[in-house]
């Protein structure tokens, strides 16, 4: 599952002018140093349901109610899967790796989640984190043998008012096999019901950023 996290970061050892304001912002995905971050995840397209999501820092889809989705007055219920199925964002890994999901990274190209692809500097609720090492917690609704988890983050100078693409992303962490070194099918490592990864946020990130978390499974052609 692909998980998108919106974060506000505060650099360790620095007094950031906007810190008081940003500390009042609610978690969206992850907060880093002086950076606001969003997180999203990609799931398994061969199943009728996907199998995992980033729970902390809270991902864009998991934080649906705070982001305006729901069944109540004034809330957006036009795409119910966003409200009921945070683990449902999924696509074949090759679509991500060949750039076919550019502009649709948060939804993984799924029409039923397309409103997650909206991208402006103010659209999404944000989480506060610091630069340096941070924990990322996944919740697995179904377990798979796994090749790796990988984490990307928007680069310094990215455009927060344009659709998200992998060209705007930098790889900041891998848990498991190096990219391009998949294990034979069925020989990946098994995950637990929850997985927590310690990922280092680069020291040069300030303001609003997005983190993109990907779970590359080993027993199908897909990623979450």
What are these regions (language model features)?
Residues 150, 154, 205-220:
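Internal, hydrophobic beta-strand segments that form the core of beta-sheet-rich folds
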Residues 1-21, 46-48:
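Short, Lys/Arg-enriched N-terminal segments with co-localized hydrophobic residues
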Residues 48-162:
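N-terminal "mature-chain" segments and other terminal, solvent-exposed stretches
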Residues 223-224:
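Extracellular and select intracellular beta-sandwich modules with Ser/Thr-enriched
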Residues 157-195:
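Exoplasmic/lumenal beta-rich domain surfaces
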Residues 126-131, 136, 140-142, 182-207:
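Exposed beta-sheet edge/beta-hairpin loop segments within beta-rich domains
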Residues 21-30:
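Bacterial N-terminal signal peptides that target proteins for export
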Residues 36-47:
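C-terminal segment of classical bacterial N-terminal signal peptides
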């Amino acid at each position: 599952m692909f998980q998108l996290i919106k974060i506000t970061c505060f650099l360790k050892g620095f007094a950031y002018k906007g810190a008081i304001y940003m500390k009042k912002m609610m978690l969206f995905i992850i907060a880093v140093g002086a950076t606001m971050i969003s997180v999203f995840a990609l799931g398994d397209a061969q199943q009728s349901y996907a199998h995992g999501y980033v729970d902390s820092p809270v991902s864009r889809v998991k934080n649906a109610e705070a982001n305006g989705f729901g069944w109540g007055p004034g809330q957006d219920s036009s795409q119910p899967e966003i409200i009921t199925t945070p683990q449902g964002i999924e696509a074949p890994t090759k679509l991500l790796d060949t750039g076919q999901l550019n502009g649709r990274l948060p939804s993984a190209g799924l029409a039923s989640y397309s409103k997650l692809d909206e991208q402006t500097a103010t659209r999404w609720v944000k989480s506060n984190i610091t630069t340096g090492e941070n924990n990322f917690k996944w919740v697995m609704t179904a377990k798979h043998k796994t090749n790796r988890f990988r984490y990307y983050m928007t680069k310094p100078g990215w455009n927060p008012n344009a659709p998200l693409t992998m060209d705007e992303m930098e790889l900041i962490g891998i848990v498991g096999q190096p990219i391009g070194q998949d294990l034979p099918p069925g020989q990946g490592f098994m995950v637990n019901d929850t997985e927590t990864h310690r990922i280092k946020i680069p020291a040069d990130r300030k303001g609003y950023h997005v983190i993109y978390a990907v779970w590359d499974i080993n027993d199908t052609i897909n990623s979450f």
